[in-house]
Amino acid sequence: MEMLQGLLLCLLLSTGGAWASNEPLRPLCRPTHAILAAEKEGCPVCVAFNTTICAGYCSSMVRVLQTVMPPLPQLVCNYHELRFTSVRLPGCRRGVNPVVYFPVAVSCRCALCRRSYSDCGNLKSEPLGCDYHTSQDSSSKDPPRNLTSPSQLPEPADAPLVPQ
């Protein structure tokens, strides 16, 4: 009987470990697929393209007595390694460079937010997209005619970053 109780105890403890797993409930900071949009003055077409961004959760702490102690620095999901690639905007006026360069996440890490190259604000209520104030009446609910359909999204072509 004592051996059976020991076996039962081991079984319960091992199962409890599976329930209380170390895995987080939210995805950690990692490269994630995203669809972004690019537009440029002098180019009539907004182009949506596939890329990889850094997204996910980083561990953070908040002090209980915030008035007595300074706030703790909060970590955010940042690029660790990145490469640059480009997308070509069609139909640009003569003299306008149709190439738009953007970063592609190779790896990500939790670090302090650097405002020099990151948007440190809250999540946006609307996804990133093109500005249609000049090309469409604001009362219209129809989608813009000049946005590439999702089935025709270009994959970014690898290109070295060339200074303009």
Swiss-Prot record:
InterPro entries: Cystine-knot_cytokine, Glyco_hormone_CN, Gonadotropin_bsu, Gonadotropin_bsu_CS. PROSITE patterns: GLYCO_HORMONE_BETA_1, GLYCO_HORMONE_BETA_2. It is found in: Secreted. Glycans are attached at N50, S140, N146, S151. One of its GO terms (cellular component) is cytoplasm. Disulfide bonds join C29-C77, C43-C92, C46-C130, C54-C108, C58-C110, C113-C120. The keyword Mitochondrion does not apply. Pfam families: Cys_knot (PF00007). Belongs to the glycoprotein hormones subunit beta family. Heterodimer of a common alpha chain and a unique beta chain which confers biological specificity to thyrotropin, lutropin, follitropin and gonadotropin. This is Choriogonadotropin subunit beta. It comes from Aotus nancymaae (Ma's night monkey).
